[in-house]
Amino acid sequence: MEEKWLTWTEWRAQTVTKFVSDAKALVKGKFAVEIYPDPVLSKERFGLDLDAIGDLVDYFHVPLSSRDYFTNYWAVTLARDFVALLKKPVVLELSAEMPTDEKLDALLKTVAYVSRLKLDAVLLLVHDSENTRQVCRFAVQNQNLRDWFKKYGFDEMTRIVDGWAKLY
């Protein structure tokens, strides 16, 4: 019988998948993994066999961190690709540690664009609760942004900001 050798990529993917499987065995509730933002070459670059790992998880967590989202097409494109590629739900994370009005405006418009995708959730990474309030207050008090949401049909964002307006 001829011995079959695994390629480096196959061996690494099996090793990572086994690690995820072992970790899942230790978890009693929902189980998710955070994956690097490369939906195309995840196996080759990181040893992630997304189909095999998808059989083990309840959802995938995809962080798309950035210092700002002034140019947001990359975040929308990657999010769309992950939703299309993965066979489990996707939870997207964006960075919200944005102290300037311009950065908050770009962040919230990016959230609006990705909210049109079939994501389970969009998480905003913040430093503290004041940072969270800053994001919400900016959205509530910025009539131009709220008008932009309405003009371009971002009904879900309008609903969310209207809810924030009851608190802020």
List the predicted regions and their residue ranges:
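Long, low-complexity, intrinsically disordered polar/charged segments
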Residues: M1-E10, V83-E97
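Polysaccharide-binding and catalytic clefts of secreted carbohydrate-active enzymes
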Residues: M1-L56, V62-D68
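Substrate-binding cleft of secreted/luminal carbohydrate-active enzymes
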Residues: L56-A79, K88-Y168
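Generic recognition of flexible, low-complexity loop/linker segments
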Residues: A23, L48-L50, L78-D81, T110-V111
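N-terminal cationic-hydrophobic initiation segments that often serve targeting/anchoring roles
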Residues: K24, G54, V83, V114-S115
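Surface-exposed amphipathic alpha-helices with a cationic face
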Residues: V20-F31, R80-V90, Q143
